[in-house]
């Protein structure tokens, strides 16, 4: 199984290093995607957290290939800014979502960098997870997605058939269970 981390900007290396320890258990190889053509070789891709306006500027080269592959069954995971990119409605004209997930999301809803925090979130099929929220977005409307976890009554991790989006950063915790959940989704389990 090949998992690619979109190497535009943000926590690229952190996701890459989160996948690598799972190599033997899931027979997975991690790659950093530097060109749109590499997406076609992957079984799943991760859009990392970072700055959503920056990611949007460079995403245009990748968007058609990503959308086509996801329509054809490829699995995708977006964290923080990656969740914004997967959304249908970003609430910000500078940031264009792909519409892969039927969610309405609000950028930087928890405040500025100084307002970042870690708190426990109970995630369906995973359990209690210490989630890292950094200038995190809020999912205002989960649409037709399944809500896997909430924080203060708002969805923070949702999924549909081919995608998982979360407003926190699992790659910064050392806890690999969210990445394992994604790998099982890629495998069809």
Curated annotation (Swiss-Prot):
HAMAP family: PdxT. It comes from Picrophilus torridus (strain ATCC 700027 / DSM 9790 / JCM 10055 / NBRC 100828 / KAW 2/3). CDD domains: GATase1_PB. PANTHER family: PYRIDOXAL 5'-PHOSPHATE SYNTHASE SUBUNIT SNO, PYRIDOXAL 5'-PHOSPHATE SYNTHASE SUBUNIT SNO1-RELATED. One of its GO terms (biological process) is pyridoxal phosphate biosynthetic process. This is Pyridoxal 5'-phosphate synthase subunit PdxT. GO terms for molecular function: glutaminase activity; pyridoxal 5'-phosphate synthase (glutamine hydrolysing) activity. The lineage of its organism: Archaea, Methanobacteriati, Thermoplasmatota, Thermoplasmata, Thermoplasmatales. One of its GO terms (cellular component) is glutaminase complex. Its EC number is 4.3.3.6, 3.5.1.2. L-glutamine binds at residues 50-52, 107, 134-135. The keyword Protein transport does not apply. It catalyses: aldehydo-D-ribose 5-phosphate + D-glyceraldehyde 3-phosphate + L-glutamine = pyridoxal 5'-phosphate + L-glutamate + phosphate + 3 H2O + H(+); L-glutamine + H2O = L-glutamate + NH4(+).
């Amino acid at each position: 199984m090949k998992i690619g981390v979109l190497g535009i900007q943000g926590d690229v290396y952190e996701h890459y290093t989160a996948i690598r320890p799972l190599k033997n258990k899931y027979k997975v190889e991690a790659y950093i995607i530097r060109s749109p053509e590499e997406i076609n070789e992957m079984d799943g891709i991760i859009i990392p957290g970072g700055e959503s306006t920056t990611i949007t500027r460079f995403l245009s080269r990748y968007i058609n290939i990503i959308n086509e592959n996801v329509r054809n069954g490829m699995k995708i995971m977006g964290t923080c800014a990656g969740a914004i990119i997967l959304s249908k409605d970003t609430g910000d004209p500078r940031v264009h979502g792909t519409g892969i997930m039927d969610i309405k999301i609000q950028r930087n809803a928890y405040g500025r960098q100084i307002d970042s925090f870690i708190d426990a979130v109970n995630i369906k099929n995973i359990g209690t997870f210490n989630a890292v929220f950094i200038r995190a977005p809020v999912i205002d409307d989960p649409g037709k997605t399944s809500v896997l976890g909430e924080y203060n009554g708002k969805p923070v991790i949702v999924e549909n058939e081919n995608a998982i989006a979360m407003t926190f950063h699992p790659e910064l915790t050392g806890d690999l269970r969210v990445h394992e959940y994604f790998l099982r989704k890629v495998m069809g389990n």
